[in-house]
A protein has these predicted regions:
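Polysaccharide-binding surfaces and accessory modules of carbohydrate-active proteins
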Residues: 1-187, 203
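Conserved, mostly hydrophobic/aromatic
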Residues: 88, 212, 326, 448, ...
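Short Pro-Gly-centered flexible turn/kink motifs
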Residues: 207-226
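Glycine-rich, aromatic-flanked loop segments that form ligand/cofactor-binding clefts
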Residues: 11-14, 18-32, 36, 169, ...
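Short acidic, Pro/Gly- and aromatic-enriched capping/linker segments at domain boundaries
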Residues: 194-208
Length: 531
């Protein structure tokens, strides 16, 4: 159930540690169990939630008889949904320091069988493309070390028998409830056993536990279907809609919105935005979203990021006045943020140069001319949360688009000692979740839409906070068919943001009839970015 490195199992392992004496051996033996009603929760992390009538929790305690290290395997059983969740708590009961080098959330073995697996690869503007490959002898893996779950591999996969299709065949699905760096591995060994492991990517991970300290892994959602991919997808759709998404928007019809980005980019004033909103209101559009460029010195993507103060000179009015004008048209008002990033040319960077993620003595690697803000630091989290809440309090804002337009490299935090730099990537994610939770606790009626250069962070972890995510920056109707098809294997249509966009399309140049563009996004959240 939870394989360990260094004591005779030579396949891919779920747990690898460095003991105080430098050895990496762990032998886990059964030490007890506990069964309870309801569903366990995980401190600081998103997870499936359910009450005592909907779920049971099984906890299996394992202990190393030599060192005293304890591992609690947690299972959440939602029987009516054919769902099992898994998570792990590692507790240092030894007499010395233990460093976790790998702590996966699950390990699953098939003792026999000939399997394939479905994974969902991609790139910017073409996310979650279905790929079906045999599980051959040896190791296969997907993952991300980009600081986020990424455009390139999604955290959902399916292991299936070879003849499985939409309506028949045996298949097993796994969805990682996390938004950061991850690794999902399969291995077929010399006697045709197959193993699947999923968890935080170990390449960027080393977590120190002093005696008495513990570490909680993120959660994995598991399901099985003997009726093909369709039934498996329905299981995941239901658990995400009802037991991951939260708040008043999880089952509520989302407003049809218009976003000014492709219509204006950075070139707008308050009057121009109101003009667009007025035309949209006459067509029945319900929400106007002001995108990038409303704050600081932000007339292009080279400056101003991090300075979350409205640029009243550019807008020609205060944020409240603009919001009131939009609301006066019978629409709701929304706004764009990218809180995890910072421009070198910004007041925030000049005031707090140590808040940017960069390695001392090295020139930082910029992407989209911007750096990452160190969300592993509590002072950074507190500052950003205060700024977000201040902006939200200043105007009638009903919706936030939360963007994240680059991957993380140069991973280093000035707040961590050298021996704890391997904790930075996961602490960053814990910080992000803390800020999101704080913002939504202060503004529970807010509709939050996730975005990461399009669909670069489309995962169950983010859906715990944002019930919809912008599916892709590719708004071409024909290419969206493939993107939305791949996404639908693991995620319900209610979570996918889609556009009726302008033609010729800004990504492909294709001219597609309005009826086609409308039909492609009809089942999804349906905005229009046109001017």
């Amino acid at each position: 159930e939870y394989s360990c490195f260094g004591t005779g199992d030579y396949r891919i392992s779920a747990l690898r540690v460095r003991n105080e004496n430098g050895s990496q051996a762990v032998t886990l033996c059964y030490a007890g169990y506990e069964l309870s009603r309801g569903k366990y929760s995980i401190p600081g992390l998103p997870a499936v939630y359910a009450d005592e009538t909907e779920a049971e929790t099984l906890g299996i305690l394992l202990r190393d008889p030599e060192s005293g290290l304890e591992v609690l395997l947690q299972y959440g059983v939602l029987e009516e949904l054919d769902i099992i969740t898994r998570a792990v708590k590692v507790v240092n009961r030894t007499m010395g320091k233990v460093v976790l080098l790998k702590a996966a959330s699950m390990c699953l073995d098939w003792l026999s069988g000939d399997y394939e697996w479905l994974t969902f690869y991609g790139k910017h503007a073409m996310e979650r493309t279905l790929q079906r490959t045999p599980i051959a002898h040896g190791i296969s893996a997907i993952g991300s070390v980009r600081g986020a779950s990424s455009h390139h591999s999604n955290l959902f996969a399916v292991v299936c028998e070879k003849d499985t299709n939409e309506t028949k065949g045996l298949c097993y699905g796994v969805s990682f409830v996390y938004s950061g760096e991850f690794l999902m591995e399969t291995e077929k060994d010399q006697i045709d056993q197959t193993r699947l492991i999923c968890g935080i990517h170990p390449d960027d991970f080393a977590w120190t536990l002093e005696p008495g300290e513990s570490f909680d892994t993120p959660e994995v959602i598991l399901s099985c279907s003997s009726e093909g991919f369709g039934k498996l997808s329905h299981n995941f759709h239901q658990v995400i809609r009802e037991h991951i998404c939260r708040g008043e928007w999880k089952n509520k019809r989302r407003p049809v919105l218009i976003n000014n980005w492709e219509g204006t980019y950075f070139n707008f004033t308050g009057d121009k935005l109101v003009s667009i909103a007025k035309d949209a209101a006459e067509l029945g559009v319900e929400l106007f979203v002001m995108d990038d460029g409303w704050f600081g010195k932000r007339d292009d993507d080279r400056s101003g990021l991090g300075d979350w103060f409205p640029n009243e000179k550019k807008l020609g009015c205060s944020l409240k006045e603009l919001g009131d004008r939009i609301v006066g048209l019978g629409m709701k008002f929304g706004i764009w943020f990218e809180p995890e990033c910072i421009s070198e040319d910004s007041d925030l960077s000049r005031a707090h140069p140590d808040w940017a993620v960069k390695i001392p003595g090295r020139k930082p690697n910029l992407s989209r001319h911007q750096m990452i803000l160190d969300f592993s630091r509590k002072d950074v989290q507190d500052y950003i949360l205060e700024r977000l809440c201040s902006v939200l309090a200043s105007a009638p804002i009903s919706y936030v688009k939360w963007d994240f337009n680059r991957s993380i490299c140069d991973k280093y935090s000035t707040s961590l000692p050298a021996e704890k730099q391997g904790e930075m990537a996961h602490r960053f994610m814990l910080g992000l979740y803390r800020v999101l939770d704080g913002m939504l606790s202060a503004y529970p009626h807010l509709l939050l839409e996730g975005c990461s250069g399009g669909g670069g962070r489309f995962d169950a972890g983010m859906l715990y906070y944002s019930p919809q995510i912008w599916c892709s920056d590719d708004t071409d109707a024909i290419e969206r068919l493939q993107i939305q098809y791949g996404t639908s294997f693991g995620y319900p249509v209610s979570t996918m943001g889609a556009h009726v966009s302008a033609v010729p399309n800004h990504q492909t140049g294709r001219v597609t009839p309005l009826a086609t563009r409308g039909c492609v996004c009809l089942l999804y959240t349906s905005p229009s970015p046109r001017d």
